[in-house]
Regions:
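Conserved S/T- and glycine-rich ATP-binding loop of Class I adenylate-forming
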Residues: 33, 39-42, 64, 83, ...
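Short beta-strand->loop structural element characteristic of the AMP-binding/adenylate-forming
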Residues: 1-3, 12, 47-50, 106-118, ...
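Conserved AMP-binding A3 loop
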Residues: 25-27, 34-58
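Gly/Ser/Thr-rich phosphate-binding loop
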Residues: 105, 135-140, 149-220, 231-233, ...
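Conserved AMP-binding/adenylation subdomain of ANL enzymes
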Residues: 55-82, 89-136, 151-152
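ANL superfamily adenylate-forming
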Residues: 1-30, 151-152, 194, 207
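Short Gly/Pro-enriched turn/cap motifs at secondary-structure boundaries
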Residues: 25-28, 220-226
C-alpha cells in the first residue's frame, strides 16, 4: 500500500530569483555554536554537547563525500543522489543525515516507526519508503537490518529498490548474517555490487572514526577502515597495538 504523502524540501524552500539575490548570510566565527546534541545516557544522565559550525562542516564533508561516497549525482541532469539514514531527531545520526545537504545530496526523511506499529509490525515500511523515493543510499541502525532478517523480509517484491547502491549501518555491531541477508536480497533485485558502509562514531564529535571505503573489499559484519584524520588502533590486554593481527 502507498505510504503517506511526502513533501520535497525543494518545494518548501523554493525562492524566486529576487528573493535569492536579496538574501544576505550572517557571517560567524569558525567555532560559533551550530547545535546541541545529547549523549545517550548510558553512563548517567544525558549530557549536552555543543558543536561549532567549522568543525562540524569539516568532519561532515570528509565523512559524506569521501567515506560515504555520496554527492550531487553520478548521473547528469538530475537532483542528486537520494540519501536516507533513518533516525529520530534525538540521535546524532539525524544531524549527520542533514549534513548530506553540504554536498548537494537530496535527503529523504521518514517520519514514523520503521517497524510498523506495535499491533501490526511491518519491517517493510522503511524499504517501501526507499523504493517510492528512489533512494540511492539507504542507512539505518544495525538493529533494523537484524529485525528484517528475523522477520524474513523479502525485498524482491519491491523493484523500486534497484536504485539503491549502498547500505549504511551504525549504532551497534552488524552481524555477518544480517549483512549476508541484505546482500542476498539485493542480488535477487539484480543489484550484484551492493556496498555496505558500516560505521562507528560518536555524539561527542558528531562524526565517525571507523567507516567505509569504496576501494576496499567487504568483510561481512566488519568495518572497512579508519577515517581520514582519525588515530584508531585496536589494542591487546597489555595495551599494545595489534596491527595486521
Amino acid at each position: 500500500a502507498p505510504l503517506q504523502p511526502y513533501t520535497l524540501m525543494a518545494d518548501t524552500t523554493a525562492r524566486n530569483d529576487a528573493a535569492t539575490a536579496a538574501f544576505e548570510p550572517l557571517w560567524l566565527p569558525f567555532d560559533h555554536p551550530l547545535w546541541i546534541v545529547y549523549s545517550s545516557g548510558t553512563t548517567g544522565l544525558p549530557k549536552p554537547i555543543v558543536h561549532g559550525h567549522g568543525g562540524t562542516v569539516i568532519v561532515a564533508m570528509a565523512l559524506k563525500t569521501l567515506h560515504n561516497d555520496v554527492g550531487c549525482s553520478y548521473k547528469p541532469n538530475n537532483f542528486g543522489e537520494r540519501y536516507h539514514w533513518y533516525s529520530s531527531t534525538g540521535w546524532v545520526m539525524w544531524n549527520a543525515q542533514m549534513s548530506g545537504l553540504l554536498n548537494g545530496t537530496t535527503c529523504c526523511i521518514y517520519d514514523g516507526n520503521p517497524g510498523g506499529s506495535k499491533d501490526k509490525p511491518d519491517w517493510t515500511t522503511l524499504w517501501r519508503f526507499g523504493a517510492e523515493l528512489g533512494v540511492t543510499f539507504f542507512g539505518a541502525g544495525a538493529a533494523f537490518f537484524a529485525n528484517c532478517l528475523k522477520a524474513g523480509v523479502d525485498l524482491s517484491t519491491m523493484p523500486g529498490l534497484k536504485t539503491v547502491r549502498a547500505l549504511g549501518t551504525t549504532g551497534s555491531p552488524l552481524s555477518a548474517d544480517a549483512q549476508n541477508w541484505g546482500t542476498s536480497e539485493f542480488e535477487k533485485l539484480g543489484v550484484h555490487d551492493i556496498w555496505w558502509c558500516n560505521i562507528s562514531g560518536g555524539t561527542d564529535f558528531a562524526g565517525a572514526f571507523i567507516g567505509g571505503n569504496r576501494e576496499l573489499p567487504l568483510v561481512p559484519g566488519e568495518m572497512q577502515c579508519r577515517l581520514l584524520g582519525c588515530a584508531v588502533e585496536a589494542w591487546n590486554e597489555q595495551g599494545e597495538p595489534v596491527i595486521n593481527e
